[in-house]
């Protein structure tokens, strides 16, 4: 079974406090709330000033090719609070990079560490990846802490 079939099998999965699913266009309001706040995506992409920009970003970057991209949802609040995805997934070399972001009102509560740890485990156990990495901005110490708490080693 190839990695794309395995990713399709894991379109939906969960942890203790979170569930992961493909993005829906109905996420646009939650996505815009997240993407229009410059603190949330400071190291990722420019702030989405208008709802139309958020609609475009959601459709083109998160929905167009959904395998390996998940909306992170809070089970209790039943809303989308972030995203986690594979960047540069190489099916032949069996390696990938993980990218992620989270609403700032969910920061420092272990949510992203929970999300990254789960995807790390799935990557090795189910998707049979041999190498996984997280590339962070040099000044993004919060993301570096998430990576380290999730078992990744910091290289500079």
What are these regions (language model features)?
Residues 1-42, 69-156:
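Acyl-donor (CoA/ACP) binding surface of acyl/acetyltransferases
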Residues 59-71:
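A short helix-loop-beta-strand connector motif used in the catalytic cores of GNAT acetyltransferases and
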Residues 39-60:
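Conserved GNAT-fold acetyl-CoA-binding loop/helix
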